[in-house]
Swiss-Prot record:
This is Protease PrtH. Keywords: Cytoplasmic vesicle, Hydrolase, Protease, Repeat, Thiol protease, Virulence. GO terms for molecular function: cysteine-type peptidase activity; methionyl-tRNA formyltransferase activity. Belongs to the peptidase C25 family. Cleaves human complement component C3. May enable P.gingivalis to evade complement-mediated killing during the immune response. Plays an important role in soft tissue infections and is a virulence factor. Its main location: cytoplasm. InterPro entries: Cleaved_adhesin, Formyl_transf_N, Formyl_transf_N_sf, Ig-like_fold, Pept_C25_gingipain_C. Its EC number is 3.4.22.-. It comes from Porphyromonas gingivalis (strain ATCC BAA-308 / W83). Residues 969-989 are annotated as: Disordered. One of its GO terms (cellular component) is cytosol. It is found in: Cytoplasmic vesicle.
Length: 989
């Protein structure tokens, strides 16, 4: 305890004797009585006098003996000093007004570590006409140029400031020569240079570069190079004893000035004077707390009221309460659970739970003066991860906020991230962030100065792998059109080259105003990872727990159907289960090498193998059969070849035609609607889409799937479970993440184009009088469009993963094993990739798409399904706006533009599609495919650009009911009593 100073007003019946003295004890005395006031009646009061006595540390009781030879203290002369000695020390401000111009400041210690004889000096505005003090006339200064270049390393050290919690000061530099670097340092021991550590440092930036420099002997001649005074406040860690200002790491600039340094002193009653008691829902759950934090695990989900009261010796304070909602979803589940056969085993694979906490799961509330309550769920950050938090509270007062950009490759500083100045001015490339920064706060941050994807008030966070990063904190300002990078007015720079984020740590960057600019204060906390394990269930029974790996093998069960579930067990609770149905199909993947050879030479189809083979046409008629070798001369069209070896089925589809036309035999009323070019099938053991660069459409009768392999009784039983789909049946075949839906319709009602695009399936959407097969990419959703009224279409979603349905119908499902093999051939892009040489990476094989659209036709979710199913939509092209509408005759953006803005997709709005500027920008995206819905006519230069062609989707078969978007909820072909206009698709090469 620091020695305290006591000021006493001494009142006694007689004047205090000059030799009287104060006696103090460090032990507590208990008075046993009080003298009667009558004892002093009739006495004459002496003169009031003031005395100041320094007390040693630990003093509790003082005595005032009044007689020179009577050291025994009466009880009336005892004073208890507990409250005084623990009281807060008075704040104080150093103005340097008592110091002399040209000399070291009084009551401060200076160290000239560089030894050039020029350290911190007091300057007076009365002596230098270029100087303006912040308050009064005096300041303290250190120079990096004073008639010649200097390399300063100067310390300005305060007196003992034990108990200080903050230091506020003002500084100024030469506005034309900024960059005089300085640091605020603290020492908990002594005043040697090696005793100090940095708590804050910065390099000031000026506005006007160049001009005159000034020293102790320089005449101003009317010039005022000094910058405005900038205020800084720095928090001091507990135990701080001395504070130093160090001027260093700069040369040949000019000076730095300090003035009005104010220390805020701490101090509070000792912890033993009061404690905290915590209540939940009116029940006392913890008392006797001396810390200002409390954690409780295993709290039941729902709403709870937490209250805190302070218990003093003489009583208790009123309770301060806060409502807290505990949400079970804060325990994140696993992601992307899959069940696949491997030999005779079932292998489960999944991804670790998301490291990002549930939105709003952390709550900080002020519930009284100086009292905060923080509610945060169990930690879910892995051992190799760090958490970065960006917090702000409307720093500028104008609702402009901040973004945090992190580059995991740490190679953008000095190029993308400038060393000084804004990130960019005006308009930046739409992929500036996606191409250079792997992690963003907020996650949808975009490089637009008018963006609303910012942190204004509140906080955002991201979990990153521990390691080295380049980062910057941006502040978009619409008024100036600049993407500013925040200033360095805090304890951590807002831009950094090669900063190390340690795993297991939580880094909180809090934005604040700093003088005329802003800055960030960084706080680092230990955020050690929570321990969690995985539990696996089969058909509702726990079969394995305590797993730490993201895979599990269930031996010997690949021939049976089961439901598998995985849950995450945290210290504080468990996550919801994630489940998947496993159904054996016994069919090899089409990409696996098959034990047979299939060749097509001219019109001759030859199959060689060791087993039985059959060749079918698309009407289900068997054309040829045999063992070991089958040869068939084709008459034209498509053919299915089925090979059975060791009880396993392999199916290939083949054809010999180069050009495929859509005829009346396949699709009604489509003779005027020409198809696209189809390349010749040349593969032996690959699907029939070997070559890249040609868009293929497949449309054919699939009676073979029903007549040859599925009994009518089975189809009827399946139809019973799907009453919503008119005269149809839906089956699921889980292979990877592709779903095949087999529908039987007497008349196909409004088969949606959406499935053909988003599912990457053959786009056969014309009216078909028999049966059609549609291949989806999504693994758990079935989509069926049907007419539920005279004018209304509705989309119904069927999740057919229910275990009861699959178990009771697995015999019917097994009958369609070969149907699966035929169907898999129709997937244009399997799993979002197209087939090419095996040497390329997955990223290189990703199919990229440009989307064109404008009208309400997109209510059928063409664009949404493209994005949600993982396709890389590189850009969206839409019109500038609709015609003026409403009272204000305002031009509204198209629905496509609004949706693209929501997703953060690049938007192109050309006036003229033939403009070179538009074509050049379009080429930069290098799309593999273009999809056009409800848009204007495209010139050849546009639709020929993608290597895989352009798909143009219509709401009806042209030319009848033509128009950009003829299909609207209020305006359908059914309105006119006609049924001949299902949607259509065309391909352009």
């Amino acid at each position: 305890m620091h020695p305290s100073t006591m000021r006493c007003m001494h009142l006694r019946p007689v004047t205090m004797h000059p030799t009287s003295r104060m006696l103090c004890w460090k032990r507590r005395l208990r008075p046993k009585g009080v003298r009667s006031p009558e004892a002093i009646r009739g006495r004459i009061q002496g003169t009031w006098r003031q005395k100041t006595v320094d007390l040693p540390a630990g003093t509790e009781i003082c005595c005032f003996p009044s007689l020179p030879k009577a050291p025994i203290c009466s009880t009336s002369t005892l004073m208890r000093l507990r409250s005084k000695t623990n009281a807060k020390r008075a704040d104080f401000t150093e103005t340097f007004e008592s110091s002399t111009h040209g000399e070291a400041p009084a009551e401060w210690t200076t160290i000239d570590a560089d030894g050039d004889g020029q350290g911190w000096l007091c300057l007076s505005s009365g002596q230098l006409d270029w100087l303006t003090a912040h308050g009064g006339t005096n300041v303290v200064s250190s120079f990096s140029w004073n008639g010649m270049a200097l390399n300063p390393d100067n310390y300005l050290i305060s007196k003992d400031v034990t108990g200080a919690t903050k230091v506020k000061y003002y500084y100024a530099v030469n506005d034309g020569f900024p960059g005089d670097h300085y640091a605020v340092m603290i020492s908990k021991t002594g005043t040697n240079a090696g005793d100090f550590t940095v708590v804050f440092e910065e390099t000031p930036n000026g506005i006007n570069k160049g001009g005159a420099r000034f020293g102790l002997s320089t005449e101003a001649d009317g010039a005022k190079p000094q910058s405005v005074w900038i205020e800084r406040t720095v928090d001091l860690p507990a135990g701080t004893k001395y504070v130093a200002f160090r001027h260093y790491n700069c040369s040949d600039l000019n000076y730095i000035l300090l003035d009005d340094i104010q220390f805020t002193m701490g101090g509070s009653p000792t912890p033993t004077d009061y404690t905290y008691t915590v209540y939940r829902d009116g029940t006392k759950i913890k008392e006797g707390l001396t810390e200002t934090t409390f954690e409780e695990d295993g709290v039941a989900t729902g709403n709870h009221e937490y209250c805190v009261e302070v218990k003093y010796t003489a009583g208790v304070s009123p309770k301060k309460c806060v409502n807290v909602t505990v949400n079970s979803t804060q325990f994140n589940p696993v992601k992307n659970l899959k069940a696949q056969p491997d030999g005779g085993d079932v292998v489960l694979k999944w991804e670790a739970p998301s490291a990002k906490k549930t939105e709003g799961s952390r709550e900080v509330k002020r519930i009284g003066d100086g009292l905060f309550v923080t509610i945060e769920p169990a930690n879910d950050v892995r051992a190799n991860e760090a958490k970065v938090v960006l917090a702000a509270d409307n720093v500028w007062g104008d609702n402009t906020g901040y973004q945090f950009l992190l580059d995991a490759d740490h190679n953008t500083f000095g190029s993308v991230i400038p060393a000084t100045g804004p990130l960019f001015t005006g308009t930046a490339s739409s992929d500036l962030y996606s191409a250079n920064f792997e992690y963003l706060i907020p996650a949808n941050a975009d490089p637009v100065v008018t963006t609303q994807n910012i942190i204004v008030t509140g906080q955002g966070e991201v979990v990153i792998p521990g390691g080295v990063y380049d980062y910057c904190i941006t502040n978009p300002e619409p008024a100036s059109g600049k993407m500013w990078i925040a200033g360095d007015g805090g304890n951590q720079p807002a831009r950094y080259d090669d900063f190390t984020f340690e795993a297991g740590k939580k880094y909180t960057f809090t934005m604040r105003r700093a003088g005329m600019g802003d800055g960030t204060d960084m706080e680092v906390e230990d955020d050690s990872p929570a321990s969690y394990t995985y539990t696996v269930y089969r058909d509702g029974t726990k079969i394995k727990e305590g797993l730490t790996e993201t895979t599990y093998r269930d031996a010997g069960l690949s021939a049976q159907s089961h439901e598998y579930c995985v849950e995450v067990k945290y210290t504080a609770g468990v996550s919801p289960k994630v489940c998947v149905d496993y159904i054996p199909d016994g069919v090899e993947d089409v990409t696996v090498q098959k034990p047979h050879t299939l060749t097509v030479v001219g019109k001759t189809i030859t199959v060689s193998w060791q087993g039985e083979a059959m060749i079918y046409d698309m009407n289900g008629r068997r054309l040829a059969a045999g063992r070991n070798t089958v040869v068939y001369t084709a008459q034209g069209g498509y053919y299915a070849v089925m090979v059975v070896v060791d009880g396993k089925s392999y199916v290939e589809e083949t054809r010999y035609q180069v050009n495929l036309s859509w005829t009346r035999r396949l699709c009604a009323d489509t003779s005027k609607h020409r198809s696209v070019i189809v390349s010749e099938y040349e593969s032996v053991a690959r699907p029939p889409f070997k070559e890249v660069g040609r868009l293929r459409f497949y449309a054919y009768y699939s009676n073979i799937l029903l007549k040859q392999f599925v009994p009518k009784s089975c189809m009827k039983r399946l139809s019973y479970y799907l009453p919503h789909c008119k005269k149809g049946s839906f089956l699921r075949f889980p292979r990877s993440s592709t779903v095949i839906t087999v529908c039987q319709f007497s008349w196909l009602e409004y088969l949606p184009v959406t499935q053909g695009v988003a599912g990457s399936s053959p786009v056969h959407t014309a009216k078909i009088r028999s049966c059609v097969e549609i291949v989806f990419r999504h693994s758990s959703i079935f989509v069926c469009y049907r007419s539920t009224g005279k004018y209304n279409y509705r989309m119904r979603l069927f999740n057919m993963l229910g275990k009861n349905f699959l178990r009771t119908k697995q015999k019917c499902l097994s009958l369609l094993r070969s149907a699966w093999d035929i169907g898999i051939k129709l997937v244009l892009f399997q799993e979002g990739r197209y087939m090419e040489s095996p040497g390329q990476s997955d990223e290189e094989r990703r199919t990229t798409i440009d989307f064109y659209g404008n009208g309400r036709y997109l209510l059928f979710r063409h664009s949404e399904l493209l994005v949600e199913n993982g396709y890389q939509v590189k850009a969206v092209v839409t019109m500038l706006g609709t015609k003026p509408m409403g009272r204000g005759h305002k031009v509204s953006p198209s629905m496509v533009k609004l949706y693209a803005q929501e997703l953060g997709l690049p938007i192109l709005q050309p006036d003229n599609l033939n403009e070179e500027s538009f074509l050049d920008e379009l080429r930069t995206y290098q799309p593999h495919l273009q999809i056009v819905v409800a848009f204007r006519m495209l010139p050849r230069s546009v639709w020929q650009m993608p290597p895989m062609g352009t798909i143009n989707l219509h709401g009806s078969l042209l030319p009848m009911y033509r128009g950009a978007a003829p299909i609207q909820p209020r305006d359908t072909p059914w309105r006119y009593g006609k049924r001949e206009l299902p949607p259509s698709a065309s391909g352009m090469r």
